[in-house]
C-alpha cells in the first residue's frame, strides 16, 4: 500500500528543493536563479524531486528564486529586440576600435605613418580595414600620416617634431627636454646574445658598405621583435659559422615553404608581419623632421602631409589616404541616371536591373577611380615576409633597413620623376576603390535579389488579380462601380466644378474602354496574356503605377477644391451674420437715441416742431409774426394756432422801431448755430409752459424764433434779415393812444443815430437763462433800449414792465466801448 504509484516519496535532506540551496550538488544552480538546474539536469535524473516542483506548484516561494518567477525573468531576458542587439554590437565594436587605435598608434607604424585613421572624418568607416592594413604594409598605399593644420618654412627640427607629435610648438631657440636627441649611435652591449640564424635571414652579403653608415649601424643594434620568430623555417640543429651554412639554411627554408604550401589553405598563406628594427633617425635627422620638412597640402582636406601621398591614376593629383578611403561606389540603383560612354560596348544585362556605378575621380570626374603610391626611400616599422618570393625579396635592395636616398642614383631618379601619362585601371600599381571595399559585388547581388523577389511577388499578385478578373467579370464590374463610387465621393456631392467632373468622366471612360478591349480579346490571346513576358509585365506595372498616381493627384485636387469651397461658404456665412448684427445694433441705437421721446406730449407736438424746423432751415430771413395784443391781463396761454403769418413784405407799422441783425464774420454764426429742431422744441416748450402773462410768453417766443433764425450758417451779408421787435411799450401804445408812438419813434430814431457808427457789429438778443445757452461776453451786442421818461404809461403798464423786463439788460458797443444799461 505504501508503494503505490500515487504516493510521493519524501526526498532526502540533501536533495530537497527547500534545503538544497547550498548543500546539494545542484545548489549552486538553484542559488543562481534556478534556471541552470532545468537545462543541465533532466527531470528523470532527479528521483527525489517532485515534478510539481518544476511546474511551479508553490507560488509562495517565488521570492526565493524558485517557481514561476524564474520563468518570468528568463522571458524578460529574451525580449531584447534586434535593434538593441545591433546597437550593443556596434557599441562594443566602437570601443574595441578605440582601444585598437590607441594600441596601434603606440606600437605600430609604417615609415613614420600609422595604420589607423587620425580622425579627419568622423563618419562610419565602412572600408575593409584588413585590406587597407595589408596594402599599407606592402607599401602599395600611403599610410595614414599625421596631418598638420599649419606649417611654416622657418620651423626648426624640434618645432617640426613637436608639430608631428601633437605638442605645443616651442620657440625656435628653445628645445624641450622631451625633444632632445643624440646623434651618436649606441654601442652594442657585450652581454646581448644575438642569434646567428636571425642575422643570416635579415642580412644580405654585399661587397661594399652603404654610405648611410648611421642607419646600418643602428640596424645592428635592434634585434628582431620577439613576437616574430623565424625558428620554424630553419633546422634546429644548425650550427657553425654563418658563411658555411648561409645557402644551406635558405634551401631548407624554401623547401619547407614549398612543402607547407601543398598542404595549406590559401587563407594560411597570407604574408607574415615583421617588425623592422627601430631607428628614429634618417640620414642623421629625426624621422619627423625628415618627413615634414617639405610637406604638401591635400587639396581635399587642406592638411599638410609628408611628400609621400597617393596620386590619382587619371590626372596625377595628390590625395591622402584619409580622403581616399571615403570615396566609394554609389548604392545600387536603377539605370535611369547612368552616364554611359557611347564608345564602350553595351553591358549584357536586362533592362530595369539594378546597377552600381564605379566611383569617379573627385578632380576630373573620370570613372574607375584609383591611386598609385611611391613609398619613401627608407623602411621603418612593419613589413611583410613574402612566402612565395622570398629569394627575390632577400636579393632586392628594398628589403634592407638602410636608407637608399644618397647611394643609388637610379632609385633616386625613379622616386622623384613625375608621371607623364595616366595609368590604366588594370595596372598592378593602381589601387581601385573597389579593392578596399571588396563586398560591393555582394551588396549589388543582394540588392538585385531583393528587387527580383519584390518584382516576382508583384507579378504574382497582378497575375492572380488578372486571372480572377477573367474568371469573374461580374465581380470586376462590381469593383469598377465601387471605384466609381469612391471617386464620386471624393469629388463631393453637388460640386459645380465642371472641369473636375469632365476629367473624372474621361478617366472612367478610358478605364471602361480598356476593360472592354480586354473582354473582347480572343481566347488564345487571353491564354497568352496569362503568362506575359517579364518586360511587358514591368511596363504594365509602370503604366498602372502612373495611372494610380494620376488618380491620386486628381483625388487630392478635388479634395482641396472642395475644402476651399467649404471655407469660402463658411466665410460668407460669417460675413452675413456680422452684417446682420451690425444692422440690428445700429437700429437699436437709432431707436434709443431718437430725436423725441416716446411720451404723449412730445408726440402731439411732433408735427408742429418738424414744420418749424423745416421752415427755419430753408428760409434765409424768416419774418417775425405780428402778434395781436391780447385783451386779457397776460394770464392766457398763447397757443400756436394764434400765430398768423403775414405776407412776405417789408411793411411795418408806423412808429415801431426797426432793428436789423447783421453778422460781421462767420464765427458768430458758428457760435449761435444750434439745431433748428432743438430751437423749435424749446419754442414749443416755452409756449406750453405756464407763464405770468402773455407778454412774457411773447418775449420767450420772440427769443426762441430769433435764435432759430440765427442758426442758418453763412448767409449773404447783403440781405439783412429784418427782425421786427415789438417792445412792451409799443404793444401798450397800440392799445391806448397814438401820441406816444411819436415819442417811441423819437427814441428809435435816437437809437438808430446812436448805432450808426457801429454798423458792422451784429445785434442779437441776449439769450435767456431759461434756454440754457452760454454766450461769450463781448461777442454779442444786444440793443433793446426802451424809452425813458414816458409819461403816458400808467401804473399798470409800469407794473407789467417792471415785472417782465426786470432781468433783461441791454449792451451797446460803439467802436469797442461797452455801455451797459439796466432797466427797472
Swiss-Prot record:
Biased region (Polar residues) positions are 210-222, 493-503, 595-614, 779-792, 807-824
GO cellular component terms, A-Z: cytoplasm
Q: Segment Disordered: which positions?
A: 1-66, 183-202, 210-242, 256-278, 397-421, 473-503, 517-539, 561-662, 735-824
Cytoplasm: present as a keyword of the record? yes
Biased composition (Low complexity) is annotated at: 223-236, 397-406, 619-629
- InterPro entries on file: Sip5/DA2 (IPR039301), Znf_C2H2_type (IPR013087)
Question: What PANTHER family does UniProt report for this protein, alphabetically?
Answer: PROTEIN SIP5
Q: What does this protein do?
A: May negatively regulate the SNF1 kinase.
Q: Which family does it belong to?
A: Belongs to the SIP5 family.
The name of this protein is: Protein SIP5
Q: Which organism is it from?
A: Ajellomyces capsulatus (strain NAm1 / WU24) (Darling's disease fungus)
Q: Which gene encodes it?
A: SIP5
